[in-house]
Swiss-Prot record:
Keywords: Ribonucleoprotein, Ribosomal protein, RNA-binding, rRNA-binding
Protein name in the entry: Large ribosomal subunit protein bL9
Any GO BP annotation: translation
Gene from which this protein is expressed: rplI
Organism: Chromohalobacter salexigens (strain ATCC BAA-138 / DSM 3043 / CIP 106854 / NCIMB 13768 / 1H11)
Function: Binds to the 23S rRNA.
Keyword NAD found: no
GO annotations of cellular component type: ribonucleoprotein complex; ribosome
A Pfam family it matches: Ribosomal_L9_C
Family the entry assigns: Belongs to the bacterial ribosomal protein bL9 family.
Length: 148
């Protein structure tokens, strides 16, 4: 199935690229979420007519993400959690907990933007957490976990 991408998608392509994807991926994910349209003659012509407008919107979203990244990179957040004698937490701190804590600190962060490749935090200490704000924009936030 050939589709025209309406946004930059990692490991697939950029805005306006015409790519071949498996039918299920296109039909069940890309098209319903507004990330692509089927590459018919009508859609190709309509996309070329709207290309400048879509590129301007994409550039605006990227600029907003870069502004958020600059704001977030200056933040050091302290979280208090119950922990044992050796610093091991009772429970863990995951992406949802971090997103909620950043939102309470006045920053607009959703759970899906938090990247924790090592898994949830299970010990007290300092951690650098990566936030994927846009396909091309990432930011790092320092999190300090202290025992209650």
């Amino acid at each position: 199935m050939d589709v025209i991408l309406l946004d930059k998608i990692g490991k697939l392509g950029n805005l306006g690229d015409q790519v071949a994807v498996k039918a299920g991926y296109g039909r069940n994910y890309l098209v319903p979420y507004g990330l692509a349209v089927p590459a018919t003659k009508e859609n190709v012509a309509a996309f070329e007519a709207q290309r400048a407008e879509l590129e301007a919107q994409a550039a605006e979203r990227k600029a907003e993400a870069e502004a958020r990244a600059a704001q977030l990179s200056e933040i050091e957040l302290s979280l208090v959690a119950k922990a044992g004698d050796e610093g091991k937490l009772f429970g863990s701190i995951g992406p949802r907990d971090l997103a909620d804590a950043l939102t309470q600190a006045g920053l607009d962060v959703v759970k899906s933007e938090v990247r924790m490749p090592e898994g949830p935090i299970r010990k007290t200490g300092e951690y650098d957490i990566t936030l994927q704000l846009h396909a091309e924009v990432t930011s790092s936030v320092r999190i300090v976990v202290v025992a209650e």
